[in-house]
Amino acid sequence: MVEIIPQNHFEVNTYVLYDETGECALVDVCSQTSREERAILDFVNSKDLKVKYILLTHPHIDHLCGAEFACREFNLPLSMSQDGVEILRTASWQAEAMGFKRINVEAIKINSLLPEEEISFGDISLKAIECSGHCPGSLGYYNAKEGYVITGDALFNQSIGRTDLQGGDLDCSFITLNKTFSHYLIIQWYIPVMDRKQR
């Protein structure tokens, strides 16, 4: 199951992935205010969930501005691609440029994920898939059993993420579309997908 909680002034989605076992993962915790933080905590507590992972699709401030809060609250590292750490270190500059609160990146412990690496919690298994182009270190999280992938800003409804920001690469975005997402059929814009082989 997936709960979508829109957050911050960019209206970015925080995702809570969970099942009947009560274990869950948070993806792109992007809360800016105590009220937004409370929305996440209220949902987790209402379902009596145990957070096992805090995942990041890519290290742009609008997707990671709540990471410090989440890592502290649940005593977990931030799981992300090692290739995105350099951009993560620019979070204070990004925050100032984009109107976000500053976060203390040094307080966040990183758990590096590799493309094709699988993580499991409860009865859910996710595969990290490379989503290069929009931002260095972009990962998608693919749930083959339920037929979706959370893509961050790599893919939108009839569009792709910007490539004019630091580290963006339009050619890489096209490679991601052709090589990675060609395996999937888009069925929802916010969490796109279903494996073509399952049709």
Tell what function each PLM region has:
Residues 1-3, 122-125:
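Conserved N-terminal entry element of GNAT/NAT acetyltransferase domains
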Residues 1-47, 140-152:
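Conserved beta-strand hairpin/beta-sheet module of binuclear metal-dependent hydrolase folds
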Residues 3, 13, 109, 115-117, ...:
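Residue-level marker for the onset of beta-strands and adjacent loop->beta junctions
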Residues 5-7, 108-111, 130-132:
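Short Gly/Pro-enriched turn/cap motifs at secondary-structure boundaries
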Residues 25-27, 55, 78, 150, ...:
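Residue-level marker for buried hydrophobic side chains located in beta-strands
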Residues 31-32, 94, 124-199:
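Metallo-beta-lactamase
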Residues 32-37, 41-121:
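Active-site HxH/HxHxD metal-binding segment of metal-dependent hydrolases
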